[in-house]
Amino acid sequence: MAREAMIARTTNETSIQLSLSLDGEGKAELETGVPFLTHMLDLFAKHGQFDLHIEAKGDTHIDDHHTTEDIGICLGQAIKEALGDKKGIKRYGNAFVPMDDALAQVVIDLSNRPHFEFRGEFPAAKVGAFDVELVHEFLWKLALEARMNLHVIVHYGRNTHHMVEAVFKALGRALDEATMIDPRVKGVPSTKGML
């Protein structure tokens, strides 16, 4: 069975069409209206081997907040839907990714218990026109809607672009690991019998 999902979300602030294949080839077709976010999601898809398609229109004439947040919501919903009953998945994923001066770690548990922790400080408030505080907003909404336990640690770095890039690459790699089918796992990977 294909582990895919299509999500459509329209509000007074944004209109988003998103499709995701967990068992893809790392192909991304992205029109987010937020160039830096587009770049980060391209890296996420490539390093997670996900096929990701996004068409988003939002009130970016105000700022990038609503579009960034709503894409996080839609991507989280797509991950949850594509996983289905979660039978046979590894459930946990952990990735360290260096990017020049920066080192980031992302740890995931696809537990159906949404939680988000972020540790680290970005030296700059913006990368180009993008407000770096929106990275936190995006990741929190992603974790909430995917119903995952998501821990993000930026260990160090000097260049904010490199630090955020390391986070999104690590996010892709950790989610790829957590969503992989492990042939040794019979049913759902939980002693409760459900996730």
From Swiss-Prot:
Example of a GO cellular component annotation carried by this entry: cytoplasm
Q: In Gene Ontology terms, what is one molecular function of this protein?
A: imidazoleglycerol-phosphate dehydratase activity
GO annotation, biological process: L-histidine biosynthetic process
User: What S-S linkages are listed for this chain?
Assistant: none
- Top-level taxon in the UniProt lineage: Bacteria
Pathway info:
Amino-acid biosynthesis; L-histidine biosynthesis; L-histidine from 5-phospho-alpha-D-ribose 1-diphosphate: step 6/9
Q: Which reaction does it catalyse?
A: D-erythro-1-(imidazol-4-yl)glycerol 3-phosphate = 3-(imidazol-4-yl)-2-oxopropyl phosphate + H2O
Q: Does the keyword Cytoplasm apply?
A: yes
Matching entries from InterPro entries are given as: IGPD_sf, ImidazoleglycerolP_deHydtase, ImidazoleglycerP_deHydtase_CS, Ribosomal_Su5_D2-typ_SF
Subcellular location per UniProt equals: Cytoplasm
Q: Which NCBIfam families match?
A: PRK00951.2-1 (NF002111), PRK00951.2-4 (NF002114), PRK00951.2-5 (NF002115), PRK00951.2-6 (NF002116)
What is this protein called in UniProt?
Answer: Imidazoleglycerol-phosphate dehydratase
